[in-house]
Regions:
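Conserved C-terminal beta-signal and adjacent last beta-strands/turns
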Residues: 196-198, 202, 207, 251-253, ...
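Gram-negative outer-membrane beta-barrel transporters
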Residues: 437-444, 527-535, 554-629, 664
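Periplasmic-side early beta-strands and strand-to-turn transitions of outer-membrane beta-barrels
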Residues: 165, 173-174, 182, 194-290, ...
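Outer-membrane beta-barrel signature, preferentially recognizing the C-terminal barrel domain
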Residues: 288-305, 419-426, 482-536, 545-571, ...
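Structural signature of Gram-negative outer-membrane beta-barrels, strongest in the C-terminal barrel
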Residues: 355-357, 365-385, 395-398, 402-407, ...
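Extracytoplasmic beta-strand/coil segments of soluble accessory domains associated
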Residues: 49, 53-65, 81-124, 142
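Short, acidic, small-residue-rich periplasmic hinge/interaction motif at the N-terminus
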Residues: 26-73, 110
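Short acidic/polar hinge/loop motifs at secondary-structure boundaries
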Residues: 121-148
Length: 695
């Protein structure tokens, strides 16, 4: 990786913005202390992810978690996924391919998580989270709202186990302009800025961040090439022992403008020079440097005074996504040998493609019936996968013949052997929901959403939520919901070296039942307890089918998980806050590709040492992880990782912070398949220092 360079235009913009906005900084503002919210503020915190209107998390018709910008600062999070790891029921698993952070809810696969940024799904048509997914910088985040449980009745596809909506800092929310820099381990360097203004009655918001890192490079003693291929074919092509290289760059720019009922948002994200470290097969790849870019343009209209009992919301979203593997994935190293011969350049696989989506949705809220609030609406989505380019020097040629070992790259684009066909998917959706206050302290929410897909059919997903304000200290909820995951293009249409597609697939399904309690015995102590039953069906996996030469994607099997999520918040004093959570999952005996930990725990303390100093300590414990079916390796041992962040705010302008991650330098590993026998080592002790200036 080349070293980080601050773009001169970026610095110039920071300087110009500081000159133009100094007058907007209120020098009489109180000094902000970046610790977790007081318990009173936490209880009254309102969310919108579970309903059309604002509700406190305890009264929302779902199991809700909220992470604020203050939480992000206090804990030293620099990426979205740093913060998600601290939520009960969520585990962020590091994937060996590209060091991607994959978000798992309640022991489900990451493909069953819906992640949105300002309501825009971050999923793509082929790879789920995206082949080069790396999270997002926290400098642009205002808050994160999370549903632990099904979300398809609200958001449609993929919210089987949970839904996350990241709300960025937009027009009207940025009260101070800010510029900051951060430097740390692994030659990591970051610069960011944000600016809010009002121009001729139009509220303007702007954020930008540049990021560059060489990444932590874990030692892989034995990769798949050494463990399997070299053993099978008596060769010595492996690059192990060797380091998996995980460097990458990121540029993130976001603009918003708002006036009256209208809001415009434009986001651009580019990840470049992204080293994948290990291929999807678990083979060291020091060559690949991929990149992707995403552009979103969103227009929103909101009118809460359309009529006496009516509101109107409309949105039009345009999205573009493209990615490519640069000079190609080195699927196997130079000198690789199999029963077809020897490949002097190794196995090279070049992928490029683009996607564009157009989404229109309109909804209204009617409150003209006593004690009822009825929301209904619908919309249309068009998703177009185009510009698919695929070249490789192995496998099957477009005419169905074998590509001879040692051949140059062959263009598979447009053939049935390309990694994906160029296709357009159309989705029509309709939703209806009623919230009924049928008695004092009782509220029933009932609704459903219908989605019709042009390539696999339709699905309807209901939800019911009964919320009872049991006492002035206790809130009880009983929640039922169904959800689905749409089959990906790869599962429906693409033949790979490992599996055949199946155009007759049904969506994966789930049914979830939650029993939740929120109890606040005093103003200083809050306890949340959630019991859940999570049943999945029609799971899509590769299985052997009689008469076929390869495994094929099929709907097969059920998987049930029962669990408990317990969390507590204690404001011990005005200076000290303590919070903790514990998750227990009890899956059935069904096999899963990679098992998740059954037990997880988290502890956090925030201590305001003085009017200028704040100190955060947090620790995460991940229990032992069972191996997948046919994996005879020992169970992977538990690990605990502690982080600490010390922040100093000199005035309402300057702030400084130092953060140490994996403070005790624990030897922690992420579970992998058998292709990486020693699993994936996680980063050891690392640190960063940052400075930010408000104006």
């Amino acid at each position: 990786m080349t070293k980080f360079r601050l773009n001169s235009a970026f610095l110039g913009l920071c300087f110009a913005t500081s000159l133009s906005s100094t007058s907007f900084a209120d020098t009489n503002d109180k000094l902000e202390h970046f610790i977790s919210l007081s318990l009173e503020d936490l209880i009254s915190l309102e969310t919108t992810i579970a309903t059309a209107s604002k509700r406190t998390a305890s009264k929302a018709p779902a199991v809700i978690s909220v992470i604020t910008a203050d939480d992000l600062k206090a804990t030293g999070a620099t990426n979205l996924t740093d913060a998600l790891q601290n939520v009960p029921g969520i585990h962020v698993r590091t994937d060996a391919f590209g060091n991607r952070p994959l978000v798992h809810f309640r022991g489900a696969n990451a493909t069953q998580t819906l992640l949105m940024i300002n309501g825009n799904s971050m999923r793509d048509l082929i790879w789920g989270f995206g082949i080069f997914w790396k999270g997002m910088p926290v400098s642009a985040i205002e808050r994160i709202e999370i549903i632990r449980g099904p979300g398809s009745a609200l958001f449609g596809a993929d919210a089987i186990a949970g839904a996350i909506n990241v709300i960025t800092k937009t027009a009207g929310q940025i009260k101070h302009s800010e510029a900051g820099v951060r430097t740390g381990s692994f030659n990591t360097r970051t610069a960011w800025m944000q600016h809010g203004d009002n121009w001729r009655g139009i509220e303007i918001g702007f954020t930008a961040e540049l990021y560059d890192t060489e990444g932590y490079n874990p030692l892989i003693p034995v990769d798949r090439q050494a463990a399997f291929e070299d053993q099978t074919f008596a060769s010595n092509a492996t690059l192990s022992p060797g380091n998996a290289q995980y460097g990458w760059r990121n540029q993130d720019v976001r603009f918003s403008a708002a006036k009256d009922h209208w809001r415009l948002q434009a986001d651009y994200t580019r990840r470049s020079d992204l080293e994948i470290g290990l291929t999807g097969f678990g083979v060291l790849d020091p060559v690949t440097q991929g990149n992707d870019e995403r552009f979103n343009l969103d227009l929103f209209y909101n009118n809460d005074t359309l009529g006496k009992h009516w509101t109107l919301d409309a949105e039009l979203r345009l999205q573009h996504l493209s990615y490519n593997s640069g000079n190609g994935f080195q699927e196997r190293p130079p000198g690789y040998t199999d029963n077809t011969g020897t490949y002097p350049d190794g196995l090279i696989n070049i992928n490029r493609s683009s996607e564009r989506s157009i989404i229109f949705e309109v909804s209204t809220l009617y409150s003209g019936i006593k004690d009822h609030s009825i929301r209904l609406g619908g919309g249309h989505t068009s998703q177009d996968l185009y510009s698919v380019k695929h070249l490789q020097n192995f496998g099957t040629a477009p005419d169905g013949s074998d590509i001879i070992a040692g051949s140059p790259l062959v263009d598979l684009s447009g053939s049935s052997y390309a990694f994906s066909p160029e296709k357009i998917r159309h989705i029509n959706q309709f939703f209806l929901e009623d919230t009924w206050n049928f008695a004092p302290d009782w509220e029933l929410t009932a609704g459903a959403r219908y989605d019709n897909y042009s390539d696999f059919g339709s699905t309807t997903n209901p939800r019911l939520a009964l919320v009872w304000q049991t006492t002035n200290k206790l809130t009880s909820k009983l929640i039922y919901g169904q959800a689905f995951r749409a089959p990906s293009y790869q599962e429906l249409f693409v033949e790979t070296s490992r599996a055949l597609p199946n155009p007759d697939l049904n969506p994966e399904r789930s049914e979830t039942l939650d029993l939740a309690f929120s109890y606040s015995s005093t103003k200083n102590w809050l306890v949340n307890l959630n019991l859940f039953y999570f049943d999945q069906s029609d799971l899509i996996s590769r299985i052997t089918v009689a008469g076929l030469s390869k495994k094929q994607f099929q709907n097969t099997g059920n998987y049930t998980i029962r669990g408990v999520e317990l969390e507590t918040h204690w404001q011990a004093s005005k200076q000290l806050n303590i919070s903790a959570n514990y998750t227990l999952r009890n899956p059935d005996s069904s096999s899963a590709p990679i098992q998740k930990a059954k037990k997880e725990a988290y502890l956090r303390t925030d201590w305001k040492l003085s009017s200028h100093w704040n100190w955060n300590i947090q620790a995460s414990w991940i229990g032992e992880r069972l191996r997948g079916a046919n994996d005879t390796r020992d169970t992977l041992a538990p690990y605990a990782i502690a982080d600490t962040t010390l922040r100093y705010a000199q005035s309402n302008t300057w702030e400084f912070a130092v953060s140490i991650r994996n403070l005790l330098d624990k030897d922690a590993k992420e579970i992998t398949g058998r292709s990486i026998p020693g699993d994936l080592p996680l980063a050891g002790r690392n640190a960063y220092a940052e400075a930010r200036y408000k104006f």
